[in-house]
Amino acid sequence: MTVETFNPKQTTTLETPAKTLEAASADSTATGNRIGFVSLGCPKNLVDSERILTQLRIDGYEVTNSYDNADLVIVNTCGFIDAAVEESLDAVREALEENGKVIVTGCLGAKENQIREVHPDVLEITGPHSYEAVLKHVHKYVPKPEHNPFTSLIPQTGVKLTPKHYAYLKISEGCDNRCTFCIIPALRGDLDSRPAGSVLDEAKRLVESGVQEILVVSQDTSAYGKDKGGRTDFWNGMPVKQDITSLARQLGKMGAWVRLHYIYPYPWVDDLIPLMAEGLILPYLDIPMQHASPRILKMMKRPGRVDRQLEAIQRWREICPDLVIRSTFIVGFPGETEEDFEMLLDFLREARLDRVGCFKYSEVEGAVANTIAELISEDVKEDRYHRFMEVQAEISAERLARFVGRTMDILIDDVDEEGAIGRSFADAPEIDGMVFINGETELEPGMLVRAVITHSDEHDLWAELVDADAEDDIEA
């Protein structure tokens, strides 16, 4: 079976410009004016793209996967790190060269001058989650077509750019933290949580449409509701507390997998673990820890008590032994010494995290960290990155090996001529490993099957389907 290349640097980030164009076009039945669309960046940006595309479809526009026959192209950009900025500017350049009429939105759009310096011919620029402004600009350059809404019905979940069996659910915008390496608050503002009733309504529609996995995302998921001042919302006529634990509990009752991403290590994360142990939500935490040196964490303006982190991890695993922890770290942060880096390696060895991504520090325009201490050379960053990944590869292999011989639920993502490719509760789409079931070509994406794990490496699992009758006999 063909094994896709795993990128250990990748975190919860989705880069799918081609997929965006094709997926939106495939669902399009409108016959109005044509809009091209490119979506870059993280799942939060993907959700923004879905919302814009949904409104375009409602207004009667057709979304096309070709620049040539588009009346206008929208590029939803990312501006988090320099590589993302470069990719976004390249995408804008390509759209201008191939089409000529381009509207830019997204995180990089918050830096209009930076875009205009490189691409002065862009029609309009808006910042992130500026849905109404984007549509207003589209109407200006490509008037709304006359159309019969009954001939271009939109699914109740809106346009989705993910496979039909999973979807991202964004629960808030912005962030109140001020990590020195990050400029997201400057781009997307402070925390702004959606009303709980609105979130749960959307989740219910997703499940009713056939979604089997809900991936909860935001800039700071565990902070959900902090800005609500303890106010209660209502859903289905019942009061719902607006905090992440209460929201997760309600989501867990809907009958789909619920996976939490972007969890900041607040003390109340402890309250989520019993929900995982009960099976209400998946025993999976995406919790970026960034470093383990107290000195570096202080410079990052991140929680600095590593001993408490280790105690929390031990406590969580005692409550929920199946818990899978994914994290990301930065090596080569300004001022990082060899001693700081060794502390990070020691933390990895002690914490035994399941999935880990690593980034070499990259200067982000406007980030405080750029001038906080002496910058680390590229050679040193590269060396530390490889040493980091070498240590973690052994740990990840050990953690995955515990699943061998175990029967697990596998959600099928894809099927090719060699068999099926799926994921277990331990694997988020796009960023984690996969489960390969060789020879099972009759399965279909979206199926949830039982399989026994036969083999593992540092990234992936291999499995064989379990005969349902045989499993019933064993359980009896």
From Swiss-Prot:
Domain MTTase N-terminal: 33-143
Keyword 4Fe-4S: yes
Residues given in the record as [4Fe-4S] cluster 2 binding sites: C175, C179, C182
Reaction(s) the record says it catalyses: L-aspartate(89)-[ribosomal protein uS12]-hydrogen + (sulfur carrier)-SH + AH2 + 2 S-adenosyl-L-methionine = 3-methylsulfanyl-L-aspartate(89)-[ribosomal protein uS12]-hydrogen + (sulfur carrier)-H + 5'-deoxyadenosine + L-methionine + A + S-adenosyl-L-homocysteine + 2 H(+)
Binding locations of [4Fe-4S] cluster 1: C42, C78, C107
A Pfam family of this chain: UPF0004
Cofactor dependency: [4Fe-4S] cluster
GO biological process, one term: tRNA modification
GO cellular component, one term: cytosol
Stretches assigned to the Radical SAM core domain: 161-398
CDD domains: Radical_SAM (cd01335)
Domain of life: Bacteria
EC annotation from Swiss-Prot or TrEMBL: 2.8.4.4
Function: Catalyzes the methylthiolation of an aspartic acid residue of ribosomal protein uS12.
Protein name: Ribosomal protein uS12 methylthiotransferase RimO
